Amino acid sequence: DFRRGKPSNHKKFGEANAILAGDALLNEAYAICFEQSAKGDRYLLASRFLNECAGVYGMIAGQSADLYFSEKGGELSADDLFYIYEHKTGKLLLAPVAVASILAGNKCYLAFENFGRLLGKLFQMTDDILDVTGSNEELGKTAGKDEKENKLTCIKLYGLEGARMRADMCARDCYGVLEGIEGDVSFLRDLVDYVLRRSN
């Protein structure tokens, strides 16, 4: 019901208007992609990649799986969890990293793609951890919501300490990918540090 300490869109303006706002933003994003695609092949490839990350094979698939497993209950596996991670948050954070690499013509595109996927996984792990350890005030949203909604999380599968250990391992994997990329990646390294240690 809250995001960043303020009422969520659907709480402030109603569910119908919130859905319409989402539709409007998606359509505006596609309009921008079409316009930019006229600039050449790299822009066309970047637009296509962004569409795949957001669409039925990306973020929407992950969100749908998240809802499905919450309703299904029963025994769930690490494969189920990491499918959600990779498609829901993974694609969301993968997209800007990989798209920027495509537009820049960077030869390390696949490494950037791998980094973005790992960063999304790390972000979702820390999100699961904060849902258990944080307060409403710290998070700017309702704490403890995952358990109430029967969400499949790394806490549910591994416990708090196990989840923290896996988050640390994932951060090390992120650093490892960055070591293989030429050029200044200090911003991305700082981003990993922030995601691992964030409090909201």
Regions found by a protein language model. Give the residues of each.
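Mg2+-dependent prenyl diphosphate-binding active-site environment of isoprenoid biosynthetic enzymes
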Residues: D1-L178, D184-L196
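Short cytosolic juxtamembrane segments of multi-pass membrane proteins
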Residues: S199-N200
